[in-house]
UniProtKB/Swiss-Prot annotation:
GO-annotated molecular function: asparaginyl-tRNA synthase (glutamine-hydrolyzing) activity; ATP binding; glutaminyl-tRNA synthase (glutamine-hydrolyzing) activity
Similarity annotation: Belongs to the GatB/GatE family. GatB subfamily.
Annotated SMART domains: GatB_Yqey
Protein name: Aspartyl/glutamyl-tRNA(Asn/Gln) amidotransferase subunit B
Disulfide-linked positions: none
Catalysed transformations (reactions): L-glutamyl-tRNA(Gln) + L-glutamine + ATP + H2O = L-glutaminyl-tRNA(Gln) + L-glutamate + ADP + phosphate + H(+); L-aspartyl-tRNA(Asn) + L-glutamine + ATP + H2O = L-asparaginyl-tRNA(Asn) + L-glutamate + ADP + phosphate + 2 H(+)
EC number: 6.3.5.-
First-level EC class: ligase
Length: 476
């Protein structure tokens, strides 16, 4: 039987505020356990939550960016459940009236444009963190994360493959960084996924029983986890079994999913409005003010790169998918380099390869955008060849100096004088008269032999374009 996969994502984006959603405690990452948890975060008796207004503004900003409906009257609810890292016995979230209502995101997959619906985006507080590896027989709990503001972005079940889900997740990841509401740092847990996965016979309309995959913090793991779950469900159904609606944990080390608990329905959480918090009233003036603060969005930047800079759709898509990458590219253009295509090629080629090899983010690259732009300009003005530029790049990566200093020190400057190159071309042709005759008789492959001999005699310093031009003139 042929199966169709149905996927919806719940993305948890930590909002980049300095204090927590309902307390003044710091949100700084990596501090000593339980050093940033105040009485409100710990749910101690007699304390009351105070809403951080900045989280409202950031949620609205996201909603405006995706052209979503904004609920101008929004309320907070208590989501009741027991877990050791939830000290109050409930989580403050939003159920019936979230800040952000229906919206949509456009993705491109296999050269096809597709709309993924967004059901809602609601605010909630994060829970603490259970730490199982600190003690042999006990679990420790760090409440520093408790109360961190989250924007949970819930999609419609519109995706039909793991690859589609990853493309959508990357779009959201780029967007929250561009509008500066989340740093998107997945290593620190600032951007996490839950995936709701089901399958059904191809052509059927009714959805299958879904499972929720948790503990996913990278695009690679998201794709792996979904594919693994799809295979598991197919195996069960093809053996006449039935899928259990449950929450499953993805283990990236063992590459498996395992059951955590049966999947709760909404009524299991006994949602009700939080009596300690007033409703949030959003004025038209505030909406317009936030709309005016929106920066150039990824889709807009991509369109500009294509129309104004002449980049291909693919190149523009790659460069705009991560804000730091787009910023690096534009900084290059602001300095020495003016050839946008050449800049793009070097960022996506040599630079990306080196960053990936050394597992470094572009923000921490040892070669700054200004430094790389100088190297690109030396290629553009024919000071060095493309081959020599790769040697200069390696030296720059190893902090041996800037492009001009390395070119000078290594003697990599090309021979610019046509007269000097012409003399060498004539010498090579004279020394290889038999090959010259073969070329004139139609053996085009001999041309590469002549180029190689010339580059050898010039130690690679001859300008390849000038060599080709002179060689063709002399041979013909």
């Amino acid at each position: 039987m042929e199966w169709e996969t149905v996927i919806g994502l719940e993305i948890h984006a930590q909002l980049n505020t300095k204090s927590k959603i309902f307390s003044a405690a710091s949100t700084q990452y990596g501090q000593k356990p339980n050093s940033q948890a105040c009485a409100v975060d710990l749910g101690l008796p007699g304390v009351l939550p105070v809403l951080n207004v900045e989280v409202i503004n950031k949620a609205i900003k996201f909603g405006v960016a995706i052209n979503a409906h904004i609920n101008q009257r929004s309320i907070f609810d208590r989501k009741n459940y027991f877990y050791p890292d939830l000290p109050k016995g409930y989580q403050i979230s939003q159920m019936d009236r979230p800040i952000v209502g229906e919206g949509k995101i456009e993705i491109t997959f296999d050269d096809q444009t597709k709309i993924v619906g967004i059901t809602r985006a609601h605010l909630e507080e994060d829970a603490g963190k259970s730490m199982h590896d600190m003690f042999d027989d006990d679990t420790a709990i760090d409440f520093n994360r408790a109360g961190i503001p989250l924007l949970e972005i819930v999609s419609e079940p519109d995706m039909r493959s793991a690859k589609e889900a990853v493309i959508y997740a990357k779009k959201i990841h780029a967007l929250v960084q561009y509008i500066d509401i989340c740093d998107g740092n997945m290593q620190e847990g600032s951007f996490r996924f839950d995936a709701n996965v089901s399958i059904r016979p191809k052509g059927e309309k009714e959805l299958g029983t879904r499972t929720e995959l948790k503990n996913i913090n990278s695009f690679k793991f998201l794709e792996r986890a979904i594919n693994l779950e799809v295979e598991r469900q197919q195996d069960i159904l093809e053996e006449s079994g039935s899928i259990v609606q449950e929450t499953r944990l993805y283990d990236s080390v063992k590459h498996e999913t395992r059951s955590m608990r049966s999947k709760e329905e909404t009524n299991n959480y006994r949602y009700f409005p939080d009596p300690d918090l007033l409703s949030v009233e959003i004025s038209n003036e505030l909406l317009e003010k936030i709309r005016q603060t929106l920066p150039e969005l990824p889709t807009q930047k991509k369109a500009r790169f294509v129309s104004e800079l002449g980049l291909s759709d693919y190149d523009a898509d790659v460069l705009t998918l991560q804000k730091p990458l787009a910023d690096y590219f534009e900084t290059m253009l602001e300095h020495h380099a003016s050839n946008a295509k050449l800049c793009a090629n070097w960022i996506m080629g040599e630079l990306s390869a080196s960053l990936n090899k050394h597992k470094i983010d572009i923000q921490n690259s040892p070669i700054t955008a200004q430094a790389l732009s100088l190297l690109i300009s030396r290629i553009s003005d024919d000071t060095i060849s493309g081959k020599a530029a790769k040697d200069v790049f390696k030296a720059m990566w190893n902090s041996e100096g800037n492009a001009d200093e390395i070119i000078q020190a290594k003697g990599l400057k090309q021979m610019i004088g046509m007269g000097e190159i012409e003399a060498i071309v004539e010498q090579v042709i004279a020394n290889n008269a038999r090959q010259a005759v073969q070329f004139k008789l139609g053996n085009d492959k001999i041309f590469g032999f002549f180029v190689g001999q010339i580059m050898k005699l010039t130690a690679g310093k001859a300008n390849p374009k000038q060599v080709n031009e002179l060689l063709r003139n002399k041979l013909f």
